[in-house]
Curated annotation (Swiss-Prot):
Annotated disulfide bonds: none
GO CC terms of this entry: DNA-directed RNA polymerase complex
Name of the molecule in the record: DNA-directed RNA polymerase subunit beta'
GO biological process terms, semicolon-separated: DNA-templated transcription
Residues given in the record as Mg(2+) binding sites: D462, D464, D466
Cofactor(s) listed: Mg(2+); Zn(2+)
Record keywords: DNA-directed RNA polymerase, Magnesium, Metal-binding, Nucleotidyltransferase, Transcription, Transferase, Zinc
Entry's family note: Belongs to the RNA polymerase beta' chain family.
Species, as recorded: Psychrobacter sp. (strain PRwf-1)
Length: 1406
């Protein structure tokens, strides 16, 4: 703190401000005195008549410095020449008034006072040190009882509490043999008496001999605290203050308002209270007042100091005149409005402005339109200097007048100033780094900022009244960074997934799609052209329609690896309009790429291919040209929307009637009692969701084609030119789901609680809704809107937590040299390969050689997999690759470039200094908000899917079984009796094309290695029940299945057959709660096999019946799921990142071995695993849990025993960190994929790395750790390397998984943790330990106001460190090279303006 105050003294010696770390400790009384410039003796603030500060008061000029610059209070000394003189009359030093911001005062307290943070912030530090309970300490502090501080030779004990009665008794008995006190004095004495080293030794001896867990916990906590005090040179008695620092007056100002009133900071009230009580107490002590009065006054002093430090922490908060609690010192720094988040992490910026945005379709990608008025204001100082240097004005004042009058020459100067001076545009909320980009301003009339349409996706902007802010980078370095790193032309790829984000959308897509579509019998069909230009001329002269099919000779330029070009001319069949696109495509791209229908996906592919093959500059020019072309053609096409375009399919009526009939049938079955209410509901919902799909399909089929007359006069079918279809098919606007509601049927709607209303809306929007239908509609839609509001906040909070946990992760080295990595496989869901292996490993570094089936090395370890590598992997049918990952990177602080791989936003290997942590957090958090804002588009229409009950092959191929355990059924098919069975279908090369999870109890209709045709059924099962299957043949015998107590007889009305249904323990009479209903099978081999039956099982066999292998003994009904909505989504992502243990989570086998069941205790089953060495693991599992494994089965460690959501902590413990990483990555990806959002796995891995930072010590070995400590993984690794080098026992530890909030609070940096959450707790803990913040992360550096150690700041810090170590700091040139790794920014070499480049580009005709 001393240094912090010193840096404030004189800004002149700025060089001294460089520091490498900040320490926080308790302040000793001497320290507080040394900060102080005098004692505040009076509670007065300023004189009400003269408005001058009162002497010795809270604003005293003698203590804190002069009120006006270089002027003492009485006015004897004025002006600068007297600087440093102390006036003899009023005692004020003549200096700048700014010193009133950093000169502190102090108050000498008449009686010591405990610091409330160390008392009440849990765990209470004072309580821990004294080993007393908080209640007891409070009773002493607030003068309710005495505490014995020195028992002398009496029978009393130290730390014993005595109330008044006991105290007087003891006095009578022992006289002054003992000392007992009350109040903070007593606590201070006790703290002074603690001999820290002695206590530590005692505890170290006591800990190994402690049996009880709670005692052990308490002792190790106390030991940690004592060691913290010992190591930090803090004295325990400093937690009780005898001298109170006073904040500089300008930080708690008193401002005169009009009307003679004053506005004051609450702190002044709180200080006044303290001073009043302190002075009263001094007087009472001088008068030797009665004990009880003094005691009361001391208690009041303690309370007022408590309120000053942290109001409301104890008792009722002190309130001001307006009944609201006063803001204490602690409130000043915590929370969103506190010092950290309001002023240190979020500053307001000068040279900025904001205005509404409008579209600027004529701009180039690197430009934005800036209103003249705004530009003039923003660039004022620059304009002044230009006016002066050009001799148009002689003084600044004159220049100012000219600018105010807006004289004509001012505009010329402004244009000169603005040329090549980029500005930053920002749209709130800035959810990822593309929300702030640099543009070159173009001066425009009007008052709105013009924005280039292609960057709207990145800003998530639209033109319905959005506003944007403009900032001016002032220094040359800032301009350089803006131009080379932040220019919109350098941000073509999205950092989240590496795909182009500068991709045409909406109108542009519509225009491009329209001209690339072929129409039958269009004008000029069948013409053949010699050159592309000839065809373009024909289009221009209206002899050729853009939709006509033609043939044309096309000359392509092909570049090889070295960049040499060859030309190749071919005759191509194409559509006339596609030549317009070919005309703007850069040289070196293939004609085939634009010879397709230009849907949004294809345009994105085209842009991607252009970026990868032709580089940034070409891509930018191409994107602009595409946009101009798209806008023009969309206008010319005349595509618009009309009510006639919503064609209702003729089949709709029949389909709905058929569905109604089905529903009636089910209603009848329900009335006759064949189906339960739940089943009826499920089936009805099922029917309607199927019908809805059928109607939608009929509608789309109907919309998708037109019958037209071709040139021969015959009818021909062609893809439709219906406006709505065009918009949806091209991806310009609208989705099949929305068209379905316009022209199909609206379908099932959800209630606000997520359940589906079983009566669907049969009408669509074109037919119009009845009142009831409208009501049902709004019912679900309103939920969508309410959700949105809530979820936006949630998503923002998720992003904040993610940024906080990942902020200090930066690329610090090139290669850590680790051998480790993670195994990547294709991502499979519902049998389909959703994400090919190639796509998942693109941009990663290979960790182990990738081998072909012939054992050749295809990709050696250490190669970065690029697009070419992906082709190699796909062509060779490789189904797993080991790649380097951030999770296994060995760099202690940060990560290495090899483990991270490709920088997604730039498309080459990541640079050192890239802050990958923040990028990851933004990439995950940004779509969260997008998703929350997009729920209501489909209007609450329930997107429920019909339940699967069988699988059939999609492709022809060969069957492969995975983890299959089957029993042959009498009917000749196989019955699956394993839990995680999967069936794959491989092609001739051996590549798996599809893979399906098959549930327990399915009938499999094929054998391993069989060849199957596309569409052939492979397996089937009943989705609504879970069967219990016997693997053996034998005779079934009932055990504990008693009618009326554990089971009840259900009679099927149709067949008259009766079957038992097992009752849950809740529904049983009390005497049969502990019975365990089971079927015992006496097998033909003479063994007994027991099948326990869970509640609600419907038994399918009778007592004494002979059963065959594969038969079903009973079925357990399963409920079907509700709707899938991102509501499940966002909270799901948050749960995964917070590593929450799910409710009723899956139970996993703790070790491999054989299963048996012990005697059950009340409500729980005893589950036992015995491994090969005879070790036994027992656990109690609640009876209602359905255990998947039966007696005598073998299980592997980590296998699921009882179904449920997996618990990430179990996965980490039983299967290791890579299994955990795969689980979290897949789960998070599933949520985002459901919403069609693409995020690269790397980002999720980065967050997981941060969640795995801590380990728990299980055996301390020869280190200074304790068992149960939580330590940084990097530190333990370093410690172990040291220990092993010295041949000592290493530390044994277990990796810990921390949720992101916990991980943020557990960071090494207390500044970062304090600015995140729970500020008081973090600072209290840090101060006691005397923690040093090394300022490694980004956040800490922002708070202390330095350049961040990432990006260009990394070079600065490296240079600083070198200079500090006495090495020559390197020159500016090389520093800049390091900062902007030159290969990274292709446009850095191109400092000519884009316009020149552009003109040159167009002049070279294709």
């Amino acid at each position: 703190m001393k240094d912090l105050l010193d840096i404030m003294k004189s800004p002149a010696d700025n060089g001294k401000r460089e520091f490498d770390s900040i320490q926080i400790t308790l302040a000793a009384p001497e320290t507080i005195k040394s900060w102080s410039h005098g004692e505040v003796k009076k509670p007065e603030t300023i004189n009400y008549r003269t408005f001058k500060p009162e002497r010795d008061g809270l604003f005293c000029a003698k203590i804190f410095g002069p009120v006006k610059d270089f002027e003492c209070l009485c006015g004897k000394y004025k002006r600068r020449k007297f600087q440093g003189v102390i006036c003899e009359k009023c005692g004020v030093e003549v200096t700048t008034a700014k010193v009133r911001r950093d000169r502190m005062g102090h108050i000498d307290l008449a009686s010591p006072v405990a610091h409330i943070w160390f008392l009440k912030s849990l765990p209470s530090r004072i309580g821990l040190l004294l080993d007393m309970t908080l209640r007891d300490i409070e009773r002493v502090l607030y003068f309710e009882s005495y505490v014995v501080t020195d028992p002398g030779m009496t029978s009393l004990e130290k730390y014993q509490l005595l109330d008044d009665e006991d105290y007087y008794k003891a006095l009578e008995e022992f006289g002054d043999e003992f000392i007992a006190k009350m109040g903070a004095e007593a606590v201070q004495d006790l703290l002074k008496d603690i001999d820290i080293d002695l206590e530590i030794d005692d505890l170290r001896e006591a800990i190994p001999n402690t049996g009880s867990e709670t005692k052990l916990k308490k002792m190790s906590k106390r030991l940690k605290l004592l060691e913290a005090f010992r190591d930090s040179n803090n004295k325990p008695e400093w937690m009780v203050m005898s001298i109170l620092p006073v904040l500089p007056p300008d930080l708690r100002p008193l401002v005169p308002l009009e009307g003679g009133r004053f506005a004051t900071s609450d702190l002044n009230d709180l200080y006044r209270r303290v001073i009043n009580r302190n002075n009263r107490l001094k007087r009472l002590l001088e008068l030797n007042a009665p004990d009880i009065i003094v005691r009361n006054e001391k208690r009041m002093l303690q309370e007022s100091v408590d309120a000053l430090l942290d109001n409301g922490r104890r008792g009722r908060a002190i309130t001001g005149s307006n009944k609201r609690p006063l803001k204490s010192l602690a409130d000043m720094i915590k929370g969103k409005q506190g010092r950290f988040r309001q002023n240190l992490l979020g500053k307001r910026v000068d040279y900025s402005g904001r205005s509404v945005i409008v579209v600027g379709p004529t701009l180039r990608l690197h430009q934005c339109g800036l209103p003249k008025k705004m530009a003039l204001e923003l660039f004022k100082p620059f304009t002044y200097s230009k006016l002066l240097s050009h001799g148009m004005a002689t003084t600044i004042k004159q220049a100012k007048k000219m600018v105010e009058r807006e004289e004509p020459q001012v505009w010329d100067m402004l244009a000169m100033v603005i040329r090549e001076h980029p500005v930053l545009l920002n749209r709130a909320p800035t959810l990822h780094r593309l929300g702030l980009q640099a543009f070159e301003p173009v001066l425009i009339e009007g008052k709105a900022i013009q924005l280039h349409p292609l960057v709207c996706t990145a800003f998530n902007a639209d033109f319905d009244g959005d506003q944007m802010a403009v900032h001016v980078p002032l220094t040359l370095e800032a301009q350089l960074e803006a131009r080379t790193l932040m220019m919109s032309t350098n941000n073509i790829l999205s950092p989240a997934n590496g795909d182009p984000i500068i991709v045409p959308s909406q109108d542009v897509v519509l225009g491009l799609y329209y001209i690339s579509r072929s129409a039958v019998n269009a004008k000029g069909e069948g013409m053949i052209f010699a050159t592309v230009n000839e065809a373009l001329r024909a289009i221009g002269s209206n002899d050729l329609h853009v939709n006509a099919k033609i043939k044309v000779r096309v000359t392509e330029t092909i570049f090889d690896e070295e960049g040499n070009s060859t030309k190749q001319t071919t005759l191509q069949e194409t559509v006339a309009g596609r030549l317009l696109i070919w005309n703007v495509m850069p040289k070196g791209m293939r004609f085939a790429e634009c010879n397709v229908e230009m849907t949004k996906k294809n345009i994105s592919k085209l842009m991607n291919s252009c970026y990868r093959t032709r580089g940034v500059k070409e891509s930018v020019i191409f994107a602009d040209q595409l946009m101009y072309l798209g806008f023009a053609q969309a206008t010319l096409s005349g595509v618009s929307i009309g009510i006639e375009d919503m064609v209702i399919p003729p089949m709709k009526k029949e389909l709905i009637e058929a569905a109604d009939a089905e529903v009636r049938e089910i209603e009848q079955q329900f009335e006759q009692g064949f189906v339960t209410a739940g089943e009826r509901y499920n089936k009805v919902v099922d029917i309607w969701s199927r019908t809805n799909d059928k109607v939608a399909k009929a509608m789309m089929d109907n919309l998708a084609t037109d019958i037209v007359i071709n040139a021969q006069g015959e009818e021909e079918e062609q893809k439709s030119f219906n406006s709505i279809f065009i918009m949806s098919d091209s991806g310009a606007r609208g989705s099949a789901a929305q068209i379905r509601q316009l022209a199909g049927m609206r379908g099932l709607m959800a209630k606000p609680d997520g359940s589906i209303i079983e009566t669907p809306i049969k009408a669509n929007f074109r037919e119009g809704l009845s009142v009831l239908q409208y009501f049902i509609s709004t019912h679900g839609a309103r939920k969508g809107l309410a959700d949105t509001a809530l979820k936006t906040a949630n998503s923002g909070y998720l992003t904040r937590r993610l940024v906080d946990v990942a902020q200090d992760l930066v690329i610090t080295e090139n290669d850590c040299g680790t051998e480790k990595g993670v195994r990547m496989t294709p991502h499979i869901q519902g049998g389909e390969i959703i994400e090919k292996l190639g796509d998942r490993v693109l941009g990663r570094v290979v960790a182990r050689d990738v081998m072909s089936r012939e054992d050749e090395v295809l990709l050696a370890a250490g190669t970065l997999i690029d697009e070419h590598g992906v082709t190699v992997i796909d062509d060779n049918g490789i189904d797993e690759v080991w790649v380097r990952s951030v999770i296994t990177c060995d760099v202690p602080h940060g990560v290495c470039a090899q483990c991270y791989g490709r920088d997604l936003a730039r498309g080459h290997k990541v640079n050192i200094g890239e802050s990958v942590g923040v990028m990851a957090a933004q990439s995950i958090g940004e779509p969260g908000t997008q998703l929350t804002m997009r729920t209501f588009h489909v209007g609450g229409a329930a997107s429920s899917t019909s339940v699967d009950n069988s699988i059939s092959a999609r492709n022809t191929g060969f069957i492969r079984f995975h983890n299959m355990k089957t029993v042959d059924h009498v009917d000749g098919h196989l019955v699956i009796v394993s839990r995680s069975a999967e069936i794959g279908i491989a092609d001739d090369v051996g590549r798996e094309r599809e893979r399906y999870k098959v549930p327990y109890g399915s009938s499999v209709l094929v054998k391993d290695g069989d060849e199957v045709e596309s569409g052939q059924a492979i397996a089937k099962w009943d989705p609504h029940t879970h069967p219990i299957i016997t693997e053996f043949a034998g005779k079934a015998r009932f055990s504990d299945i008693i009618d009326g107590s554990t089971a009840t007889v259900k009679i099927d009305e149709a067949t008259g057959m009766s079957s038992f249904e097992i009752l849950g323990s809740k529904d049983r009479p009390s005497n049969s709660k502990d019975l365990r209903p089971a079927i015992i099978l006496d097998t033909t081999g003479g063994k007994e096999v027991v099948y326990f039956l869970p509640a609600e099982t419907i038994i399918r066999v009778s007592d004494g019946e002979e059963v065959t292998a594969g038969s079903v003994l009973g079925r357990v009904p399963q409920a079907t799921s509700g709707t899938k909505d991102i509501t499940g989504g966002l909270p799901r992502v948050a749960d995964l990142f917070e590593a929450r243990r799910p409710k009723d989570h899956a139970i996993m086998a703790e070790m491999s071995g054989v299963v048996s069941f012990g005697s059950s205790t009340k409500g729980k089953n005893r589950f036992i695993i015995t491994n090969e060495d005879g070790e036994v693991h027992e656990e109690l599992i609640p009876k209602w849990r359905q255990i998947n494994v039966f007696e005598n089965e073998t299980v592997a460690r980590g296998e699921v025993i009882a179904d449920g959501p997996l618990n990430p902590h179990d996965i980490l413990r039983l299967q290791g960190e890579t299994a955990l990483a795969n689980y979290i990555v897949d789960e998070v990806q599933d949520v985002y994929r459901l919403q069609g959002v693409k995020i690269n796995d790397k980002h999720i891995e980065v967050i997981i790395r941060q969640m795995l930072r801590k380990v728990e010590i299980t055996d301390a070995g020869d280190s200074n750790y304790f068992k149960g400590d939580q330590v940084e993984y990097a530190d333990v690794k370093a410690t172990n390397e040291k220990l092993l080098a010295e041949d000592k026992f290493p530390v044994q530890f277990e990796r810990q998984l921390l949720g992101i909030t916990k991980a943020s609070l557990a960071t090494e940096s207390f500044i970062s943790a304090a600015s995140f959450q729970e500020t008081t707790r973090v600072l209290t803990a840090a101060a006691v330990e005397g923690k040093v913040d090394e300022l490694r992360g980004l956040k800490e550096n922002v708070v202390v106001g330095r350049l961040i150690p990432a990006g260009t700041g990394l070079a600065y810090h490296a240079a600083r460190k070198k200079a500090k170590e006495g090495k020559p700091a390197y020159d500016v040139e090389s520093a800049l090279d390091a900062a902007f790794d030159i290969e990274a920014t292709t446009s850095a070499q191109d400092f000519r303006s884009f316009d020149e480049a552009f003109a040159q580009e167009l002049s070279q005709d294709k």
